[in-house]
Amino acid sequence: MALRPARCYRTTERRSYTRKEYVRAVPQPKVVHYVMGNSSVEFPVEVQLISKSDILIRHNALESSRIAGNKYILRECGRTGYLFNIRVYPHEILRENKMAAGAGADRISDGMRLSFGKAVGTAAKVKKGQEIITIGVNPEKFYAAKEALRRCSMKLPTACKIVVTKGQDLIRD
């Protein structure tokens, strides 16, 4: 069955659902790596991608964002010239009450009886002003980090802003 659109799970009004011991099978998050690049070096410039609204970000959106940003920053800075860090983890469990469609579906379907749903994925609950991704680089690669975060934000379901949190005085305009 196809993946339900993200707009079905985007809002954060509903209560959190994170207790894995009550759920039979929770799908593993698609995010493979949370820290990429050179983690042994302290970089002088740090740039962050910050959410502008409260939202749930699905694990596949986080993974596609990670791939897009990491691919660009790796090409620009090399393997040891950056630190890419995803700051959120998809704890929220997303459920779906699957409905049969087509001819004769009314005989097969249970409708809204036992409509709790099965776990179909996970999502990260992000608040307004929370950091989603952080990139650390040297001052000469600041614009590459900024472009990588812009590419990351294109894959996420919320408006984001890019903020320099460390090393503002080292950046030349």
Swiss-Prot record:
This is Large ribosomal subunit protein uL16. The keyword Cell cycle does not apply. It holds the Pfam family Ribosomal_L16. PANTHER family: 60S RIBOSOMAL PROTEIN L10. Keywords: Ribonucleoprotein, Ribosomal protein. Gene3D superfamilies: Ribosomal protein L10e/L16. SUPFAM superfamilies: Ribosomal protein L16p/L10e (SSF54686). InterPro entries: Ribosomal_uL16, Ribosomal_uL16_arc, Ribosomal_uL16_CS_euk_arc, Ribosomal_uL16_dom, Ribosomal_uL16_euk_arch, Ribosomal_uL16_sf. One of its GO terms (biological process) is translation. The keyword Oxidoreductase does not apply.
